[in-house]
Amino acid sequence: MVIALILRTVTDYGLINRQLGAYMGIGYALLLLGIGWFRYAKASPQAPVFTVCGSVLMYLVVTETNLNPKFHLLPLLPAHLLLIVSGVIAAATTNRFRVRLPLSIGTVGMALAAIVLTFHEAAPDFRFLIVTLLAANILGHFTVRLDRCAWVRWSLFGLTVFASLWWAYRIILPVLAEPSTAASARLQLPWFLAGVGLFGCAYLAIAAREILAGKTDRIGTYFLAIPTLTVLWAFGSAQYLTTVLNSYNYQINFLSLVVSAIHLVVVWVLSRKRTEGQGGLGAICNAGALLLALSLPTVMGSAIYALPILSIAAYALIIFSGFCQSGGARLTSYLLQIHATVYLIFLLITKKTNEPLDVLVACFIMTIISYLHYQWARSNRPPTDIRFFERYDQKDFSAALLLLMALVSGFFMVEGMTSALISGDSPGRLATLTGLQSIIINGTAAGLVLWGYFGRDVEKRNIAILVIVIGGLKVFFHDLVAAKGLPLVVSVLSFGVATAVLSVIMSRWQKRMATPDEAP
């Protein structure tokens, strides 16, 4: 590094031509990388010094000769090529001599330097950045596996996300300041979308390769998390830009549906090739389901139309998990069904939809599908290829949430039907609806208690207790304020009947405690 500082000083004082000085600095950096290679071959303790100094010097010279107004000598194409060459040399050193340091400095350094090259006073060209970051990720993931190198992969992913957000910022900032520049910003949008899509495919391939090659206890957190994180980052940034610029939004959401289907195809292919007990499929399946949930409402034109399809997709996914013997896919199906129901609650509470018939149809479909989903889960034990079912939920108690989702959808269906039967101009309409809601909740709870008793099903009994608690909270903390007269009397009476039924059934249940069929 002393020689490098001498070269810089001589160049600054004009003793040698600046262009010649820059080229000498690049040549000296390559020389240090070469010396580092041969030092590693001889197992010299000084080898890391040459490799690190050569890599750092290369990145400093390339960025300065491109950005510094004194130079501006190195165009973007050769600058990025030099970064890639230095990264390849560092990765080759790691691969040949089984040492971590060259890979760490080489890949992370080239990614950082490539991002720095975009911090230019003029409009930067991000197309070269795509190639360099892709090369850094490939080198970081496909170079020989070494212990304690996970931070390199996380760093590369973080830098890739930061670079895309920086790119999006450079595209959208002029538009936010001056809307008339939107036309020129739209010209950059296809390149941004192509770059984000390319990285999405790359990370999917990386995760699939690791899942196929690894074993259950060796698949790291990074490879399990990267598909979902990629969907959140890639779809989120693309959705934001296309929405603000009002361009390619529908196309991006439709393409996302296709990509979500590709995720399921990848899961199917991996399930055919993996060894027994090998996990990791749920990571890719979860990413595909998330992409489906994010993009389908836009493609359908209304969220209320998309929710029944999401519910059906969740049911299909648990059947798919049975064929694949994937506990991860099964857990994803639970989450997707819960998401659809929670989204339905959000739409109804915020009154985002004003079509009663559409709501009734959606609630009816989701009630039926959620219950079928629950029945399938209770008829088929979950695979234990993921830690969730192997350690935390061995008896699949989480499937009870599916029955709860069916009850929620059914409640809104019946509540919508009763609301439609009561004229909007009727006096005391709100109080009447409040009383009817309590009757629906408490009546459902009483029915569940009887169903659980005659079916010897503890799970349904426990859910009935939860529903009764919800009904009681509604009666005493809402109905006493919002209702009066006959609706209030009926509301309180319905809760009393439900608790009476529960009390009688619970007293008789004690006689059946020793029955083997009672277990859920």
Predicted feature residues:
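Alpha-helical multi-pass membrane segments and their bilayer interfacial helix-loop junctions
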Residues: 1-520
